Amino acid sequence: MFDKLEAVAQRYDELTQLMAQPEVATNVTLLQQYAREQRELEDIVTTYREYQAAQRAIAEAEAMLDENDPELRALAQEELDTQRKRLATLEEQLKVLLLPRDPNDSKDVIMEIRQGEGGDEAALFAADLFRMYTRFAESRGWKVEVDSLTENGIGGIKEVIFQIHGEGAYSQLKYEGGVHRVQRVPATEARGRIHTSTATVAVLPEVEETEIEIKPEDLRIDVFRSAGHGGQGVNTTDSAVRIVYKPGTPEEIVVTCQDGRSQIQNRERAMTVLRARLYAREQEKRQREIGASRLAQVGSGERAEKIRTYNFPQDRITDHRIGQNFSNLPAVLDGELDKIIEALIVYDTAERLRASGISNN
């Protein structure tokens, strides 16, 4: 571990020297590249230097234990105990910082929510989830853009595709992919019976055009008049866009966007969603090829995987991947997801540490 830390610290200092060179300072692209690389190393280097400072403090305190003055020895022992605890804490932090980063963590996110089993109640639950994620994003100061929304006429959602733009959006929301289940008494249930319904959530990192190639000949692009929520026409021009990737083949993907202000905007959004889906497909294929059944220890985010149950009668949310329960269900559905997300990150980090085999060498 410490050999790697030394190499990281050396590269960090090297980048500082490179950015000070006149030929780099005048090359904006290269300067940004070096600055971005240095930012990625900064937390590791800062923590490592704190670790080295703690090591020096321990050595100094140990030397003071040989003093004749009992008060000085007592102070030295106190300092030694403090710095040893600090050293152990910093060492654990360094192990986490050295874990490979998900290259998508800093990206914006595309989310898709669809009603599952349960009819209208499933559509109402899908609407609850959409509101939950929207409120969570707003609490972070992130921007939410709806690409496509299909409602069922009674306030429920059959399908919604939306984008969330914000620093680290994917790192926070990537654990939300899968089947969400709700247990509650529907408003239309006269006998008070508890019904179980589901909704499916897909979470995709936004992908740059340069990250995945899409050939124009593989696309069929249709334009049509956008419809309002519930099927009411709201636009007198053909502003809605449907993009079909490799139509009529097993690889076919259909993306429809109609909530943008113009045909150009809807086309751009549809292409963004298509790139994300193709990227996700490539990632899944790569995982299968290397024999991995999970994209992360807490779950793959596959649509068939039941990840969480929202039990209204017992005011309990259970995340099945980590076997942990959470209370205050109304607050969670109002966007207070922090405790759940933090628990998932902690669990995932611990599992990745266990699998990484990072040692103190």
Curated annotation (Swiss-Prot):
Q: What does the PTM comment of the record read?
A: Methylated by PrmC. Methylation increases the termination efficiency of RF1.
Query: Where is it localised?
Result: Cytoplasm
Q: Could you tell me which InterPro entries the record lists for this protein?
A: PCRF (IPR005139), Pep_chain_release_fac_I (IPR000352), Pep_chain_release_fac_I_sf (IPR045853), Prokaryotic/Mito_RF (IPR050057), RF-1 (IPR004373)
Tell me the domain of life: Bacteria
Annotated GO CC locations: cytoplasm
An example Pfam family from this entry, by short name, is PCRF
Matching Gene3D superfamilies: 3.30.160.20, 3.30.70.1660, 6.10.140.1950
Q: What is this protein called?
A: Peptide chain release factor 1
Gene transcribed to yield this protein: prfA
Which organism is the protein's source?
Answer: Chloroflexus aggregans (strain MD-66 / DSM 9485)
A GO MF annotation of the entry reads: translation release factor activity, codon specific
Q: Which family does it belong to?
A: Belongs to the prokaryotic/mitochondrial release factor family.
**Which residues does the record list as N5-methylglutamine (modified residue)?**
232
Q: Which HAMAP family match?
A: Rel_fac_1
Keyword field: Cytoplasm, Methylation, Protein biosynthesis
Q: What does this protein do?
A: Peptide chain release factor 1 directs the termination of translation in response to the peptide chain termination codons UAG and UAA.
